[in-house]
Swiss-Prot record:
Its main location: membrane. It is a multi-pass membrane protein. It comes from Bacillus subtilis (strain 168). The keyword Transmembrane helix applies. The chain crosses the membrane at residues 9-29, 45-65. The gene is ywzB. This is Uncharacterized membrane protein YwzB. One of its GO terms (cellular component) is plasma membrane.
Amino acid sequence: MSVLGQQAAIGIVVHLIFIAVTWWALQAVNIDPLIKKGKVVQARLLMILLTIAIGTAVANFFLDYLNYSQQLPYLF
């Protein structure tokens, strides 16, 4: 398995893990008072999109940090 293939596999797994963790964390937020009557589908879609956005941002931060830490030996 080449290095690029390994990085791609790690990237996919990390994104899925952080999206799942974000979904789990957002379940603690009570958005019921914010939802208008009859707008349940839109609220669920908002939670899904918010989960993907936050999870992807955190995963990108983690992967960037991992990548930068692997490149540090080239500094010296």
